[in-house]
Curated annotation (Swiss-Prot):
The active site is at residues 19, 37. It holds the Pfam family Acylphosphatase. Keywords: Hydrolase. It comes from the Archaea. This is Acylphosphatase. Residues 4-90 form the Acylphosphatase-like domain. SUPFAM superfamilies: Acylphosphatase/BLUF domain-like (SSF54975). The gene is acyP. Belongs to the acylphosphatase family. It catalyses: an acyl phosphate + H2O = a carboxylate + phosphate + H(+). The lineage of its organism: Archaea, Thermoproteota, Thermoprotei, Sulfolobales, Sulfolobaceae. Its EC number is 3.6.1.7.
Length: 90
């Protein structure tokens, strides 16, 4: 089933390749959406795709790239909206 997932990631997640890491894994999983740095030092991720793929992406997000340190994750699933054509970073 298609779903939308909102994720906010805290820790050492800016300046360490975190958004690009998420973008690469999202593309491999057929997920569309974006990853964006926020002023508070966290990263916001909005992703749409099949629920199973979103769960896999969430596992990658929890691990993060080698230089990152994920300290806390908040996430929720929502109804699919289909508003993205690819996965972007901001």
């Amino acid at each position: 089933m298609l779903k939308r997932m909102y994720v906010k990631v805290y820790g050492i997640v800016q300046g360490v390749g975190f958004r690009r890491y998420v973008q690469i894994h999202a593309a491999r999983l057929g997920i569309k959406g974006y990853a964006k740095n926020l002023p508070d030092g966290s990263v916001e991720i909005v992703a749409e795709g099949y629920e199973e793929a979103l769960q896999k992406l969430l596992e990658y997000i929890k691990r993060g790239p080698p230089l990152s340190r994920v300290e806390k994750i908040e996430y929720r699933f929502y109804e699919y909206k289909g508003e993205f054509n690819n996965f972007d970073t901001y």
